[in-house]
Each structure stands twice: as structure tokens, then as C-alpha cells.
Amino acid sequence: MNFVQENNHVLYLWAGTVGPEIEQEVNAIKTIPNVQVNVENVERLQLAEYGKSQFDVILAQVATGNSTLVTLLVKLLKPKGKCVFRDDSAASIEQARSNLLLAGFINIVASDSNVYVAEKPDYEVGSKSKLSFAKKSNVAAVWKLDDNEEEERIDDEELLDEDDKAKPTEESLRVCGTTGKRKACKDCSCGLAEELDAEAKGKALTDTSAAKSSCGSCYLGDAFRCATCPYLGMPAFKPGEKIVLTDTQMQADI
């Protein structure tokens, strides 16, 4: 009874028939001050309504190979509580130790008289703890802005000058023929390709300087032109500006 101390709550489990040695052991436990003892038959333990982590010490005449019962005893013990098994089976010390470890006991001590003392870990069965395996690195907050009112900031209104705000002219937007030699680009859309093609074929170009638009919106671009407008496909131009059209452009598609 060296495992029982003052103020302990003890569970005594017996198997078979009640003999005089059981009464002697229970009476010896009761002589320890402030000790509460519960005596229970092994076969009726699962029917008893004992709570989890209720006992400080359990004295059990239980075979360590009874995994169901051994696991139940782990739950009945308080953390760091001890359970003393008296195993009369033919199990070896190695086998008994393995059975107790698998049930959840630690610090198992065996004696030659088939008595095993096992301890419950210092935590409840089923408890969990968060494990952090990620290594934290000290990363500088590169994009963090300090709340400093004296810091110089760029005014977006100063990013553009008056020249940048000026509306570009048609000649400045014309890409073809800007290298000195009049040569149309591969995907010319400013009309130079048609102009050079007409000159190469010797075709006369139609002067539309005196032409008047019936809708008055031809110069705005294709989005504002009629379906039969001869200026379709040409860039926008200024009102009254001289525009040269080829013979093919003067013919309607339908």
C-alpha cells in the first residue's frame, strides 16, 4: 500500500471471489488519513457510473492483456495518477509492458511477482496541442508606409505639363512616312497606302475639298459615319480639311 497517500481517492478492483486478503488490503488502505476507497468487481466496472479522472490510485487484479478494461482504467485515473496491476496471466514482462504502453500508460515498472506499476501522463486522454513547424523569419515590411505627414509626396497634377495636355494634330499622329521617305506601314490605316498605290497606277485622285457631308459627322470617324460613307476606314479629320480619296473608295460596296 506504499502507493496510497493521504487525501487520495482509491479504486480497488477485485476478481473472482472475495477472500480474507482482499478485506485486509482494503482495511489497511482505510487506515491512511483522509483516504476514500471504492471497492468494485472487475466484471461490473463498466456498469458503474464513475467519472473520468476521478481516482488518484487504482489497485487492480486485472490482466494487462485485457485492452478494453486497461484503456478504461486510464480514463478513470487523474493525470499523473498510478495504477497497480496484479497480472496472474502467463504474459511475459515484455508483453505486459507493451500492452500498458499501447493503452496510454507511461513509466511502467515491473516486479518478479507479476505486479506492474504504471502512471498516467500529465494530460487528459484525447487532449491536443497545436504544433507549429513553420520557421518564422524576420521579414522586413517593405511595403509598409509610415504615417508621417511631413513626408514629401508627389502631386499628380504636376506629372503633366501644358505640352502634354495639348491635343495632338493629325500630322503628329500619322505614323507612315515619318522617316523622310514616303513609305506606308505594313498595316497602314492612315490612307497613305491607298495614296501611294493610286500614284503608282497613275490613277487620278478625287479632290473632296469642296465636298459637303449630308450628315455633317463624317470628320468624326467611322463611329459617326453612314454605311455608304466614302470616308469609311479613314481616320478622323478636321472639318473642311482636304481629304484625297481613290477611285475604289468612291464606289459603294452594295
From Swiss-Prot:
Cofactor: [2Fe-2S] cluster; [4Fe-4S] cluster
Keywords from the named record: 2Fe-2S, 4Fe-4S, Cytoplasm, Iron, Iron-sulfur, Metal-binding, Mitochondrion
GO BP field: iron-sulfur cluster assembly
Location in or out of the cell: Cytoplasm; Mitochondrion intermembrane space
Region (Fe-S binding site A): 176-190
Record remark on domains: The C-terminal domain binds 2 Fe-S clusters but is otherwise mostly in an intrinsically disordered conformation.
The name this protein goes by in its record: Anamorsin homolog
